[in-house]
Amino acid sequence: MVCKVLIALCIFTAGLRVQGSPTVPLPVSLMTKSSAPVATWTTSAPHTARATTPVASATHNASVLRTTAASLTSQLPTDHREEAVTSPPLKRDVNSTDSSPAGFPSTSSDGHLAPTPEEHSLGSPEATVPATGSQSPMLLSSQAPTSATTSPATSLSESLSASVTSSHNSTVANIQPTEAPMAPASPTEEHSSSHTPTSHVTAEPVPKEKSPQDTEPGKVICESETTTPFLIMQEVENALSSGSIAAITVTVIAVVLLVFGGAAYLKIRHSSYGRLLDDHDYGSWGNYNNPLYDDS
């Protein structure tokens, strides 16, 4: 029993400390973290339809903000009474970063936040009302981070457009100098050709110099074609007909036969028995090479 009493006293003192702790305004980073995820409100106030607008709609006009602020301030007493009944369990420690209970946004930390730049520009006194349970600062704070997020997007788009235009201008500037000297070149040539006929004479050898250069690749191609024997045979077949090829083969065979026939005849004539066919006398020495010759 004593332990239970001590635990109850500890819980009671902790609750008193939480309730009596001063509400310190949170920095901008905590404001964005606590207000950005909130998309809709689930209170029973008559202006819930106005509060259910998404966070992304950050492009509101000044007139819309003034009317919403005036309507919210006119409904502050009723909202304060309704939330006064349900607000005690919603109070929490300033240093805690835990989310509020389900169905209720964290309004205790957003109540003493400084007004956004949009509120200062509007100059409406309703924007500086201390909302200790009211919902107008939540709406304004939910609009502030979205406007802050849209401003970098616009700056990025402007920087991209500026870079694209600068690159386009640089390319145009690079193209124009190349085209500029080409344009006056033709009038000068026409002027020189009209006044001095020698310019034509100097311009004529240019194609003459190019003509041998054009023929040189043709020669190289012909030489490469002559190196292959298959192409040579094709050229020979195309140049000679079948009759000319037959005549060439016959002449080659006849020449071969004549050469071999003459060699055989000379060999037989100069053999050991060839001297008998001769009619002249060989002298006293006789023909000792012939076995039929009888010297006796």
Swiss-Prot record:
Which residue intervals are annotated with compositional bias (Polar residues) in the record?
A: 96-110, 168-177
Ranges annotated as spanning the membrane: 245-265
Q: Where is the composition biased (Basic and acidic residues)?
A: 78-95, 206-217
Q: Which residues lie on this side of the membrane: Extracellular?
A: 21-244
One GO CC term on file: plasma membrane
Which sequence positions carry the modification called Phosphoserine?
Answer: S284
Region: Disordered, residue numbers: 72-220
- What are the Low complexity biased-composition ranges? 139-167
| Coiled coil region boundaries | none
Q: Which residues lie toward the Cytoplasmic compartment?
A: 266-296
PTM entry text = Highly N-glycosylated and O-glycosylated.
Against InterPro entries, the record matches this protein to: PARM1 (IPR031431)
Extent of the signal sequence: 1-20
Tell me how this protein sits in the membrane: Single-pass type I membrane protein
Q: Which UniProt keywords apply?
A: Cell membrane, Endosome, Glycoprotein, Golgi apparatus, Membrane, Phosphoprotein, Signal, Transmembrane, Transmembrane helix
Q: Does the keyword Amino-acid biosynthesis apply?
A: no
The free-text function statement in the UniProt record for this protein reads:
May regulate TLP1 expression and telomerase activity, thus enabling certain prostatic cells to resist apoptosis.
| Recorded family membership | Belongs to the PARM family.
Q: What is this protein called?
A: Prostate androgen-regulated mucin-like protein 1 homolog
Which species does the entry assign this protein to?
A: Mus musculus (Mouse)
Q: Which gene encodes it?
A: Parm1
